[in-house]
Amino acid sequence: MTRKIPGIIPLEPYCREMVWGGRRLAELYDKELPTDVSIGETFELSAYEGRESRAAVGPLSGCSLQDLVEEYRADLVGAEVWSRYGGRFPLLIKLLDAQQNLSIQVHPDDAYAQLKGLQDAGKMEAWYVLHSDGGRVAYGLEDGVGREDFSAAVTNNRVAEVIRFYTVERGDLVFSPPGTVHALCAGVVIYEVQQSSDLTFRIYDYDRPGLDGKPRELHIEQALEVIDFSQQLPGPVPCPDLRGQVLVESEHFVLHGCGLESDSAEHAAEGSFLALTLVGGRAVIRDGEGEYALGTGATALVTAGGVCEIAPLGDEKLEYLVVAVPT
């Protein structure tokens, strides 16, 4: 017999060691990280195989998100989301700690992934900068750079000369549709929401070894096939004051930024589940069945049809991001 589905499921992340990672997520957000390794990513909301987040508390504690998707199906994700994606949970939320530059890379779209018979979907993503030590992001190409120019830059080891770099601060938003050449650079910590996919075509990786001591694979041919050379990107958008506005509205996810100094706010998961991630302050989140305390950097899932109330804990302003699948 299926267990009763909770309205709110606080989540425990999967931690992933990366050659470019560090320990800032423990320092900034008190994350419990594996000892003596450089953690680059925490998968806060993830049903991606081998990197699943898990229910943190309550009767479902320890259950992976994928297990919960398989058990509750449309009751968890929403009827329209289930009809569109089936058992494949569509979104993934991470926190990333870049203590070194990430590889310069590009992601394909769904059509390319299907055309090539790839297992994963395409990958659209958005970043919200949580912390920056004067760090930068690589984002888009310089004006007039075409396929031949880019290919020549790769061949001559001059990729950085044809890419735009921006210094970022907390509150900056970066939206990367498929086909965008991009990279997170050293000294930046971000929140990332993306399609649940690991399709990444590396273009340049600084000639460094991976965790196994060997150079990581590059994917130049595939990258040239999927880069959108016609893109005109605005650069990072400052969004330091979260007050309930839509930050990103796309075919795969809608991202809101919210802020509270007192009182409380209510969020209804209409048509799709919601995922709430605290990016400043502490909160209590509740519905008619339970109440949970969340610290900065924590994520909770509100199941489809559920309604939650969120309120600040303490005097610090509460800031949080809310994401859903458009229906």
Regions found by a protein language model. Give the residues of each.
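Transition-metal
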Residues: M1-V145, D205-Q231, L255, T327
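His/acidic/aromatic-lined binding-pocket segments of jelly-roll/cupin-type domains
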Residues: I93-K94, L102, Q119, E125-Y128, ...
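Short beta-strand segments in beta-sandwich/barrel cores
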Residues: G135, S264-A265, G281-R286
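Short, structured beta-strand/loop micro-motifs enriched in basic residues and often containing a Trp
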Residues: A152-V159, R282-V284
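An exposed, glycine/acidic-rich loop-and-rim segment of catalytic or binding clefts
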Residues: N156-V162, L173-F175, V181-Q232
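Short acidic-glycine-tyrosine-enriched beta hairpin
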Residues: I163-F175, G288-G306
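C-terminal amphipathic alpha-helical segment
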Residues: F201-F273
